[in-house]
Design a protein with these regions (language model features):
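Glycine-rich dinucleotide-binding loop and its adjacent helix/turn
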Residues: 55-71, 96, 133-147, 175-204
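Ferredoxin-type iron-sulfur electron-transfer modules in oxidoreductases and energy-metabolism complexes
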Residues: 1-25, 42-71
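Residue-level detector of alpha-helix initiation sites
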Residues: 18, 83-85, 108
Length: 204
């Protein structure tokens, strides 16, 4: 980045990060990569999050990076859930030559990226949709409105649909309540439900 070779920077990031524009915006870099940066011992760590965000945005606006994909190996993998874990898993497997299908219970893929994180932190159409398209460009298929345990089961995916393995990335959808009086009253929402309602109803 310092040398101005943003394409090379994007290629380096793409080797290990499937969702760089998202990670650069919402990951807690201060406790993860930046928290481990040796420069932070005596000064400020490298602003890894901001650099990743910049490079990812530049890459998206300039044609993107085409990761190297191994030849098809003939194995099908099912991924349950299209949140960040499911998308990252599907992306990595597709690069290794697997035929990957994501099964998403809701009507749009993305999980917490789509329904949980507010628009001002993570633009849905500009960033999330573009990152999902980059995963699909690797050959990953996404089926929405498919509820694991009802529409399909793990057994049916393995025994009837011909999948060699199933990755379950269903997310942390159920909140943990505090057990205080009145928490079950009408109009009292968990953080998850509040954020989902906000995103679905476009309250912003």
């Amino acid at each position: 980045v310092a040398a101005g070779n943003f394409a090379a920077a994007a290629a380096v990031i793409a080797e290990d990060s499937s969702l760089p524009a998202i990670c650069g915006r919402v990951c807690p870099q201060e406790t993860q990569c930046e928290g481990s940066c040796i420069l932070g011992v005596k000064g400020e760590p490298v602003a890894i999050g901001k650099l990743e965000r910049f490079v990812a945005d530049w890459s998206r606006e300039n044609g993107g990076v085409k990761p190297e994909v191994a030849p098809a190996n003939g194995h099908k993998i099912a991924v349950i859930g299209s949140g960040p874990a499911g998308l990252a898993c599907a992306s990595d497997l597709a690069k290794l030559g697997y035929d990957v299908t994501i099964f998403e219970a809701l009507h749009r893929p993305g999980g917490v990226l789509e329904y949980g994180i507010p628009e001002f932190r993570l633009p849905k159409d500009k960033v999330v949709a573009a990152e999902i398209e980059s995963v699909k460009a690797l050959g990953v298929k996404i089926e929405t409105n498919v509820i694991a345990g009802r529409t399909v089961t793990i057994d049916s995916l393995l025994d009837e649909e011909g999948f060699a393995a199933v990755f379950v990335g269903s997310g942390a959808g159920l909140p943990k309540f505090m057990g205080i009086p009145g928490e079950n009253f009408n109009g009292v929402f968990s953080a998850n439900e509040f954020l989902t309602r906000n995103n679905l109803m476009k309250a912003y």
